[in-house]
């Protein structure tokens, strides 16, 4: 990976999209809890919608892929984000348990996890999903 201006633009775009998708995910989670009364079902629905939106936005704006929708690419994207999700969860829990101010401000623990997961998620998407050289 080269850290040139194009790479930095992609990384920053990926991060901004992630922030927007987080708001979308949290909103959907709240909405589907209200509609179904089942938090577990609401979470599954909100995560599925958020991951789909994340794939489409990153495909379109971060990696600038043109052409028809590629469902295999979407599945590959979702699978590629699993390591980042695990890193996110781990760092969120570590922050929650070991940063005294994070226990009362869970958004801090969530932010720590999100930042740690961002690096893994971007790397996986950049190298394994939207890498033109690898996918040629």
Model-derived features: positions:
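Alpha-helical membrane-protein topology signature
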Residues: 1-136
